[in-house]
UniProtKB/Swiss-Prot annotation:
Protein name according to UniProt: Hemoglobin subunit zeta
PROSITE patterns registered for this protein in UniProt: GLOBIN
Function: The zeta chain is an alpha-type chain of mammalian embryonic hemoglobin.
Species this protein is from: Capra hircus
Family: Belongs to the globin family.
Gene name of the encoded protein: HBZ1
Sorted UniProt keywords: Acetylation, Heme, Iron, Metal-binding, Oxygen transport, Phosphoprotein, Transport
GO molecular function, one term: haptoglobin binding
Residue(s) carrying Phosphothreonine: 29
Amino acid sequence: MSLTRTERTIILSLWSKISTQADVIGTETLERLFSCYPQAKTYFPHFDLHSGSAQLRAHGSKVVAAVGDAVKSIDNVTSALSKLSELHAYVLRVDPVNFKFLSHCLLVTLASHFPADFTADAHAAWDKFLSIVSGVLTEKYR
């Protein structure tokens, strides 16, 4: 699956706004993930998962930074996220379905923060992009 030129433009345009609010977007995305998919909490037994905790904010920032790495390497997401894929597959052993759950939560968060920008076309482009990211993160599981 590859992105069209229009989809890339949409992703890059919205990313310029997301990147200025990375900590807020990341924290809210994780809070949404743990609320909607509480089984994901099992991967964070050492974290304070209360709303707005320092650990949640820090990890949320890391998540959005990883998405940013993928955006910056939009034509080669595989190389940008290879080490992260290895970490999640071999060390953390995260169930791959959680990447889809996280992607969905990020889409909802983006829609709530950027309602004017998150058009149907933007939703479709970001959904496709995050599917690519999720696919890359699960490559090492095969």
